[in-house]
Amino acid sequence: MDASRVQPIKLARVTKVLGRTGSQGQCTQVRVEFMDDSNRSIIRNVKGPVREGDVLTLLESEREARRLR
């Protein structure tokens, strides 16, 4: 793996749980706010139990999930 292309791991706090997604509802769509610059927030899909206030470790911080319909 090329070390120059590796992104740093970012911490993000769950600010709002938006709903369930996936073919069987196995993922939860959440809005997260980055802890290093708190004015930036994105929507991510999370697998497993999650609630507001949880801190997620994001290996890929640029990818954003499509919104629920």
Swiss-Prot record:
Keywords, sorted A to Z: Acetylation, Cytoplasm, Endoplasmic reticulum, Nucleus, Ribonucleoprotein, Ribosomal protein
Compartment annotation: Cytoplasm, Cytosol; Cytoplasm; Rough endoplasmic reticulum; Nucleus, Nucleolus
UniProt-listed Pfam families: Ribosomal_S28e
GO process terms (BP): cytoplasmic translation; maturation of SSU-rRNA; ribosomal small subunit assembly; ribosomal small subunit biogenesis
Family, similarity comment: Belongs to the eukaryotic ribosomal protein eS28 family.
Subunit (UniProt): Component of the 40S small ribosomal subunit. Part of the small subunit (SSU) processome, composed of more than 70 proteins and the RNA chaperone small nucleolar RNA (snoRNA) U3.
Protein name per Swiss-Prot or TrEMBL: Small ribosomal subunit protein eS28
Origin species: Danio rerio
Annotated gene: rps28
